[in-house]
């Protein structure tokens, strides 16, 4: 059965099967997650909201690939130069609970891990009560070279902060929650960058991302109706690009 290409955008590709997912109440796959992250990197529709250079959005495929790389040294060799990981102040990791290298795009749940360099810790958002927390620890074990004093594996939980997260009301919107949290946090980062007249070094990412204001904002903005609209918004964005 054919699955025609609808849109090719930067390093992402959207097929008809992805459109079908967005049109129905289905779990978002890695293709849709990757597309929207690329869209956010480019600053959205008007290309004005570009993220600071100190912030990195990793694609699901990179995170998935690193899950099966044996050593941190190999990950550094593969990704340090092209992505400049150690120069970034904030790194977003979209996670699934797929541990099977033979199943591309598999898993049953998305969650979000964020490394904050100035904090020297990772923060974690999960729309189903830390369902993927063991996967977060697993990914930290692969990227603990980012920490200023890399700990032994037994102490990794000390470097993870579970954040209160808006909770999904069904079994399929987790990916939309991840994208929505990323987008709302990026809006705050971009605004803070503008307030500092583009001087990125003046931004306190630790204070910004861990503030009570930020957490309250996420709960205020990311409601079930917001999530429902976000699914439609992503679909419409793709269809506009198709034209």
UniProtKB/Swiss-Prot annotation:
PANTHER family: SENTRIN-SPECIFIC PROTEASE 8. The keyword Protease applies. Residues 12-185 are annotated as: Protease. InterPro entries: Nep1/2-like, Papain-like_cys_pep_sf, Peptidase_C48_C. GO terms for biological process: protein desumoylation; proteolysis. Disulfide bonds: none annotated. It comes from the Eukaryota. Belongs to the peptidase C48 family. Gene3D superfamilies: Adenoviral Proteinase, Chain A. Keywords: Hydrolase, Protease, Thiol protease, Ubl conjugation pathway. One of its GO terms (molecular function) is deSUMOylase activity. Its EC number is 3.4.22.-. The active site is at 109, 126, 174 (nucleophile). The keyword Hydrolase applies. It is an enzyme of class 3 (hydrolase). This is Probable sentrin-specific protease 8. GO terms for cellular component: nucleus. Protease that catalyzes two essential functions in the nedd8 pathway: processing of full-length nedd8 to its mature form and deconjugation of nedd8 from targeted proteins. The gene is senp8.
């Amino acid at each position: 059965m054919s699955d025609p290409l609808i849109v090719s955008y930067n390093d992402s590709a959207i097929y008809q099967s992805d459109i079908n997912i967005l049109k129905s109440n289905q779990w978002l796959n890695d293709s849709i997650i990757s597309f929207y992250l690329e869209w956010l990197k480019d600053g959205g529709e008007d290309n004005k909201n570009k993220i600071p250079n100190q912030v990195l959005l990793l694609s699901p495929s990179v995170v998935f690939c690193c899950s099966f790389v044996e050593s941190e040294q190999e990950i550094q060799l593969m990704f340090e130069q092209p992505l400049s990981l150690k120069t970034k102040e904030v790194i977003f990791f979209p996670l699934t609970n797929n541990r099977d290298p033979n199943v591309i795009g598999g898993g049953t749940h998305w969650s979000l891990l964020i490394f904050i360099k100035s904090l020297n810790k990772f923060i974690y958002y999960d729309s189903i009560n830390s369902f993927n927390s063991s996967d977060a620890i697993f990914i930290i074990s692969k990227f603990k070279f980012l920490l200023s004093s890399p700990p032994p594996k037994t102490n990794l939980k000390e470097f993870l902060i579970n954040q209160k997260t808006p909770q999904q009301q069904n079994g399929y919107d987790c990916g939309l929650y991840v994208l929505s949290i990323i987008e709302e946090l990026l809006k705050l980062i971009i605004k803070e960058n503008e307030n500092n007249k583009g001087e990125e070094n003046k931004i306190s990412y630790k204070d910004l991302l861990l503030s009570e204001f930020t957490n309250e904002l996420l709960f205020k903005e990311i409601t079930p109706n917001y999530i429902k609209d976000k699914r439609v918004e992503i679909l419409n964005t793709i269809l506009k690009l198709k034209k």
